[in-house]
UniProtKB/Swiss-Prot annotation:
<feature type="transmembrane region" description="Helical">
    <location>
        <begin position="33"/>
        <end position="53"/>
    </location>
</feature>
<dbReference type="InterPro" id="IPR050083">
    <property type="entry name" value="HtpX_protease"/>
</dbReference>
<keyword id="KW-0472">Membrane</keyword>
<comment type="similarity">
    <text>Belongs to the peptidase M48B family.</text>
</comment>
<dbReference type="InterPro" id="IPR022919">
    <property type="entry name" value="Pept_M48_protease_HtpX"/>
</dbReference>
<protein>
    <recommendedName>
        <fullName>Protease HtpX</fullName>
        <ecNumber>3.4.24.-</ecNumber>
    </recommendedName>
</protein>
<feature type="active site">
    <location>
        <position position="140"/>
    </location>
</feature>
<dbReference type="GO" id="GO:0004222">
    <property type="term" value="F:metalloendopeptidase activity"/>
</dbReference>
<keyword id="KW-0482">Metalloprotease</keyword>
<feature type="binding site">
    <location>
        <position position="139"/>
    </location>
    <ligand>
        <name>Zn(2+)</name>
    </ligand>
</feature>
<dbReference type="Pfam" id="PF01435">
    <property type="entry name" value="Peptidase_M48"/>
</dbReference>
<keyword id="KW-0479">Metal-binding</keyword>
<dbReference type="InterPro" id="IPR001915">
    <property type="entry name" value="Peptidase_M48"/>
</dbReference>
<keyword id="KW-1003">Cell membrane</keyword>
<keyword id="KW-0862">Zinc</keyword>
<dbReference type="GO" id="GO:0006508">
    <property type="term" value="P:proteolysis"/>
</dbReference>
<keyword id="KW-0997">Cell inner membrane</keyword>
């Protein structure tokens, strides 16, 4: 109940702030043009703010310990491997971090190719062979080299804009229909209108999530291909086979999970940010 209340309160707060900002800027959201400007500012604004603070958020959320000075041979090998792969991929050396988690996972994040972070869990670092870890690192470096963080941020901005715009257009149509059938012509009223917008935001948000997940799966196949080039196809297949034998990934927040090696499994593949491991293995074997 508290989670639902916070979700509703957050949504209403965003709408309130958005309305105030649009008023200050003199944008009339009652027109299609004004509404589109409103939707684009908040759709892309939120996505790019998340991208800008992605490294900071990842470090805080996952408790990442950035390796500034390797303490042992394992950490030294980890840093040297990422450095070599980054040079091969033509990108600036990412920060390398370890986070405490028994599950085998890793992720890459950061606002650009030259300002990124590659992090691995202790479960992966000490639960996989060195060849398998090397392949996972190559997968994450490939995400950075392919510019996946920026690409998915742009896609997220587009779908956010669609959700905000479409929800308010449909709510306006509903309000006009109610108003035309109302003798007093008052329409839905402010609170009913906001409730309709909230529900439509949720419904269109589900559709948007499906679109983003589709593009995320495509980027995963590309990162697997990049890893095969950097570390070797057989090493990447071995790493995916090891992940397939392990439990489902559960501990990573959604923002980091999108660029992790091991995604959450779902009955509905279209909602998954990662393709099933079986399909990823088959795609590599077919290369």
């Amino acid at each position: 109940m508290k989670r639902i209340f916070l979700l509703i309160a957050t949504n209403l707060a965003v709408l309130l702030v958005a309305s105030i900002v649009m008023s200050i800027l003199g944008v009339n959201t009652s027109t299609m043009g004004g509404l589109l400007v409103f939707a684009a500012i908040f759709g892309f604004g939120g996505a790019f703010i998340s991208l800008a603070i992605s490294k900071w958020m990842a470090k805080k959320a996952m408790g990442c310990e950035v390796i500034t000075m390797p303490r042992d041979g394992t950490e030294r090998w980890l840093v040297e491997t990422v450095a070599r792969q980054a040079q091969q991929a033509g990108i600036k050396m990412p920060e390398v971090a370890i986070y405490q988690s028994p599950e085998m996972n890793a992720f890459a994040t950061g606002p650009s190719k030259d300002n990124s972070l590659v992090a691995v869990s202790t479960g992966l670092l000490y639960g996989m062979s060195q060849d398998e870890v090397e392949a996972v690192l190559a997968h994450e470096v490939s995400h950075v080299a392919n510019g996946d963080m920026v690409t998915l941020t742009l896609i997220q901005g587009v779908v956010n804009t669609f959700v905000i715009f479409a929800a308010r257009v449909v709510a306006g149509i509903i309000n006009n229909v109610v108003s035309s059938n109302d003798e007093e012509g008052e329409g839905l009223g402010m609170f009913a209108y906001m409730a309709v917008v909230f529900v439509l935001d949720m419904l269109f948000g589900i559709l948007a999530s499906i679109i983003v997940a589709y593009f995320s799966r495509i980027r995963e196949y590309r990162a697997d291909e990049g890893a095969a080039r950097l570390a070797g196809k057989h090493k990447m297949i071995a790493a995916l086979e090891r992940l397939r034998q392990g439990p489902e990934s559960t501990a990573m927040p959604a923002q980091m999970s999108a660029f992790g090696i091991n995604g959450k499994r779902s009955m509905a593949e279209m909602m998954m940010s990662h393709p099933p491991l079986e399909k990823r293995i088959a795609a590599l074997q077919a290369r």
